[in-house]
Amino acid sequence: MSEPKAIDPKLSTTDRVVKAVPFPPSHRLTAKEVFDNDGKPRVDILKAHLMKEGRLEETVALRIITEGASILRQEKNLLDIDAPVTVCGDIHGQFFDLMKLFEVGGSPANTRYLFLGDYVDRGYFSIECVLYLWALKILYPKTLFLLRGNHECRHLTEYFTFKQECKIKYSERVYDACMDAFDCLPLAALMNQQFLCVHGGLSPEINTLDDIRKLDRFKEPPAYGPMCDILWSDPLEDFGNEKTQEHFTHNTVRGCSYFYSYPAVCEFLQHNNLLSILRAHEAQDAGYRMYRKSQTTGFPSLITIFSAPNYLDVYNNKAAVLKYENNVMNIRQFNCSPHPYWLPNFMDVFTWSLPFVGEKVTEMLVNVLNICSDDELGSEEDGFDGATAAARKEVIRNKIRAIGKMARVFSVLREESESVLTLKGLTPTGMLPSGVLSGGKQTLQSATVEAIEADEAIKGFSPQHKITSFEEAKGLDRINERMPPRRDAMPSDANLNSINKALASETNGTDSNGSNSSNIQ
């Protein structure tokens, strides 16, 4: 009878534990690989490489971004786009879902596309989205169109994830090039002379299409004014059934810009001889929402499109694109696609593992400090007077309590690691609220972001609970919909309308040679 083979006690530190998951390519694509002899990007090669989490040489990434920006710079504030066209909403760094979008909407080689902005932030593949979309813009400058969203700016990309992503995957040079390119993005599009397409919505300072054409867009979006409103405004929650007579009210959800009403939209459409407004900017459970119909045309006065399925991996929403052809509008929905996993805020595995190590270290410290009993401490301190001995005992007990508290924090971090990561992902800064971990599981269950950035609370969050509904995820993520604090924000006691009316300097008369909208066909 043969003896059983001994088990090798050595554990390899170089072999991949999960061999079924391929390692990302270490080779960075060169200019010769990305561009053909005519200087056009090979988008199929680029797509295949990015799908494997591959990267480009920095000079190649910069070339794509700057060449795309030079094309965008030549375009007008208000694009004129003919049908047929496929309109897409927010992408938010969900590159693998963007690939699904092109499967559903059609190949960019033979399909006209209009994107309504928000290509970056929140998702962990934002730079891949920018590089691929900008490469498509270089290849198809007359059939693929990109508008600016509220996240295409320095203020939000520094606050959320895009700047950090660029620095980790490439460099700050690439990030700066992206910011310059974002300044070139058009603000709106007139589709088929019937539909105004923007990211956010209307402004009390924009009454005609020429008001959009006259804006100076080549800058960081201001904290208020017509350019801000185009990117940030939303329809009222009770749009079409308003309880107020005001056309525009302060947007309390965003902390800037306005809510606009059904009468405001109908008045704008009638004044400019338009059929509807197409916009993005708000997550939708079904991927789209059609609002109350216009009384004069019988067509929805406003349509929201959102193209990031299972937004943030917790919303459980569908995504949609809008296809308009031969005066027929079709909505095509799609679900999320699998994607590689990143820890929150691009955390590395060593940082992530610290709670596990920390728990063991603090456990050892507590055990060391607990070796001495009260009797032993008392016998050692016979030489001290009563007050000194008592004080020394109290110091040691306080140290034990402090180490014990630290041990409890690390224990919560380890045991509830998944919930902690989810909560981090839903807070604006990626940091946990003060005091959450030291309070243990019960405190984590009622954690709020109050101590971090805002008065809005993340309510109902429990370590044992999984987010299952769209409304729950939207409520938890509400704080992230606000404009982050900025120095040039409008004074809280100022009148919004009077300040916006004073912004005559925002218009410079350029880009005013655009055609007026024609009658609805």
Swiss-Prot record:
Interaction with PxIxIF motif in substrate: annotated segments: 327-336
Catalytic activity: O-phospho-L-seryl-[protein] + H2O = L-seryl-[protein] + phosphate; O-phospho-L-threonyl-[protein] + H2O = L-threonyl-[protein] + phosphate
Top-rank lineage group of the source organism: Eukaryota
Motif window: SAPNY motif: 307-311
Alphabetized UniProt keyword annotations: Acetylation, Calmodulin-binding, Cell membrane, Cell projection, Cytoplasm, Hydrolase, Iron, Membrane, Metal-binding, Nitration, Phosphoprotein, Protein phosphatase, Synapse, Zinc
Active site, per annotation: H151 (proton donor)
Keyword Nucleotidyltransferase in record: no
Binding positions (Zn(2+)): D118, N150, H199, H281
Binding-site residues, Fe cation: D90, H92, D118
Membrane topology field: Peripheral membrane protein
Annotated site residue numbers, Interaction with PxVP motif in substrate: W352
Chief site of localization: cytoplasm
Family, as annotated: Belongs to the PPP phosphatase family. PP-2B subfamily.
Name the UniProt record assigns to this protein: Protein phosphatase 3 catalytic subunit alpha
Naturally occurring in which organism (per UniProt): Bos taurus (Bovine)
